[in-house]
């Protein structure tokens, strides 16, 4: 998310001598790394009601396709998804299976840029948080034959021995997500919900 990148930049300017290392992994892997005390902090996506960390944000989850292509009409439906263990992937597959709609996983990536590359090129459909849809990508809904999706909760988790610096970064993340949600609600009329 742009807001996450902005938050990291804000923190880096405030603490130029602190080196932050970022891992982009499925939530299941992040939980394992936290349990092994190999991460100080993790942002984990889950369904509201299943949160175990500090909820930073809740937002609508949408099916997404390129504005200028018709991948969403293909049979079987081509999908660009995150790796196994990601809730967005699970929600997409469960939704399509529930409809009995044929699909194929055409692209798999651990990063949002990899998923969006396939979608913006018109090669696949994906499931994402509404706030991360870039220009040229639009949401799909029931009128186009796509099932509803659960909202996403973005939660902050801490490792076993978190330093004062990591707690400070957690504070920056909290503030960054709050500012992003406010900005999103003011510009789109589709607010993300702060916890």
For each predicted feature, which ranges?
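A late-sequence structural motif
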Residues: 3, 144-185
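Central regulatory/effector-binding core of bacterial HTH transcription factors
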Residues: 1-49, 191
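Secondary-structure junction motif
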Residues: 78-99, 163-166
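Hydrophobic residues within well-ordered alpha-helices
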Residues: 34-35, 92, 117-122
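Beta-alpha-beta core module
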Residues: 50-54, 59, 120-161
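Ligand-binding cleft/hinge of the Venus flytrap
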Residues: 7-15, 89-102
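Flexible hinge/capping segments at coil-to-helix
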Residues: 51-84, 94
């Amino acid at each position: 998310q742009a807001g996450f990148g902005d938050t990291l930049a804000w923190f880096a300017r405030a603490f130029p001598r602190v080196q932050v290392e970022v891992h982009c992994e499925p939530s299941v892997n992040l939980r394992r790394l936290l349990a092994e005390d190999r991460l100080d902090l993790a942002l984990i996506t889950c369904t509201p009601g299943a949160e175990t960390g500090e909820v930073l944000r809740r937002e609508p989850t949408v099916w997404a396709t390129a504005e200028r292509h018709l991948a969403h009409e293909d049979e079987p439906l081509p999908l660009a998804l995150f790796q196994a263990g990601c809730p967005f992937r699970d929600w997409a597959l469960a939704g399509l299976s529930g409809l009995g709609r044929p699909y194929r996983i055409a692209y798999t990536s651990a990063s949002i840029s990899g998923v969006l590359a396939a979608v913006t090129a018109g090669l696949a459909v994906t499931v994402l948080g509404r706030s991360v849809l870039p220009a040229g990508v639009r949401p799909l809904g029931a009128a186009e034959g796509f099932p509803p999706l659960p909202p996403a909760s973005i939660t902050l988790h801490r490792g076993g021995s978190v330093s004062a610096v990591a707690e400070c970064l957690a504070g920056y993340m909290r503030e960054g997500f709050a500012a992003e949600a406010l900005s999103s609600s003011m510009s789109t009329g589709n607010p993300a919900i702060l916890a």
